[in-house]
């Protein structure tokens, strides 16, 4: 899983490194910039300071969501929600929302690789391009990650 969140150059402040196994998110950008500017962010602000190597190393779970990116329901984002996902360790579970209201399917009628199931499980170390759905082979992992997703954001 190789994805650059962002690239920063700050001599004597940021050590050069390439780390493809740490979980980072766009929610980490604001806390990192605030810490770099000497401002302590509010405790209620989500995300971690990416300059704090211990905090980054400690994180082993991250949640993701995909939306239609329209303004149909800016105050109710679940109305244009396509997926909720959880990465925990080497595993990534993608929970697709079937036929969300106000969202048209992509060309061809399907929005994801496997239209036969709403759940896709990937081993990101063995399959970084997410081509092999392992949900049927690892139902215990699916149950665990699905529960984590629902604890994070339950959708009716």
Task: Tell where the protein language model's regions lie, with residue ranges.
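Catalytic cores of eukaryotic secretory-pathway lumenal/extracellular enzymes that build
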Residues: 3-4
